[in-house]
Every structure is written in C-alpha cells, then in structure tokens.
A protein has these predicted regions:
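Zinc-dependent deaminase catalytic domain
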Residues: 2-173
C-alpha cells in the first residue's frame, strides 16, 4: 500500500468545500463568535416567553453553556404552559414564580457540576442579566459580562457597577 503524502497534506489544508476560501481578516471577532454561540445555545430553550443563551469563556476557551429552561428531568414549559403567563406575572417581576432557570444560572450550575472554575471568566449572554443572575455572576467571580439585548433592571445594573465587573453591550461588528 502506498501513501501519497502530498495529497493527504493538501486535503488537510482545505477545510472548506472546493472553491470556498476564508481569509484570516474575514473571520468573526471573538465577541461575534461567542455571541453567535450564545444565540445558538438559546435555541435549546423550551421557555414560551424568552429564548436566552449564555456561554462562559476564559482565555478564549468555552467553559460552560446554559439556556433558560426547567431543571433536568422536569416537564418543559412548552408542554405544561407558562406558569407566569397563567398567573399574569409581568416580565421582570417575581422571578421566583417560574418553573425555569435562567441561562446564566444554568451555565454556572453546569460549571459547578463538572468542577470547572469560572472565576475570572467572561460570560456572553444574549440578554442583559436580571438582578438574580447579576448577584450569582458576582459571587461566581465573573470578571466580564457581554450582553446583546438590554433588559430594564436598574438594580441589576447598580449591583454590577458597584461590583466592578466590566459590563459591555455587544452591538455587532
């Protein structure tokens, strides 16, 4: 059996289909890359109100992901209906009246469950964290929050400002 090294090397050099190339300057920025991933993670939600995804990153490496949804093993809201809607609870109020967890909470829990240290990490989330998630991110040691869509929670913003966590709105590049 004869192995042709040149052909093998060429096949490894071409990660794209024939005729498709990607120049280094056309690659997405790290912010764009991780925010796209947060939006992709959000597609796993079974929440009937909002699709949120989060990606925790350190040194440009993904540590954990999370999306909003009920705890593992429980019936999804897409099957049971939205408790908050049934009770007439407005968005942004009474977070405890919900069967689900927020994306940031699930990402923190996944990291803890698998023994991953997220202190000093950055979280990319497609919606600005609520006050409950802000407090958890502060105590988890997150250094930076990059969010895409604003969320009107003044207390969250005040606590994050006081904590010294860098908070940036991602507006695309």
């Amino acid at each position: 059996m004869m192995l042709t090294i040149g052909a093998m090397t060429e096949s490894f050099r071409r990660p794209f289909p024939e005729g498709v190339t990607m120049a280094a300057d056309n690659r997405p920025s790290w912010d764009e890359y991780f925010m796209k991933m947060a939006n992709d993670v959000a597609t796993r939600t079974t929440c009937l109100r909002r699709g949120v995804g989060a990606v925790i990153v350190k040194d440009r490496r993904i540590l954990a992901t999370g999306y909003n949804g009920v705890p593992t093993g429980l019936t999804h809201c897409s099957e049971t209906g939205c408790l908050r809607e049934q009770l007439g609870v407005p968005s942004g109020q009474r977070h405890e009246i919900c069967r689900g967890l927020h994306a940031e909470q699930n990402a923190i829990i996944q990291a803890a469950r698998y023994g991953i240290n997220i202190a000093g990490a950055t979280i990319y989330v497609n919606t600005q964290p609520c006050v409950v998630c802000a407090k958890m991110l502060i105590n988890a040691g997150i250094d930076e929050i990059v969010y895409q869509n604003p969320y009107p929670d003044e207390l969250s913003q005040e606590l994050l400002a006081e904590s010294g966590i860098l908070v940036r709105e991602y507006t695309g590049e």
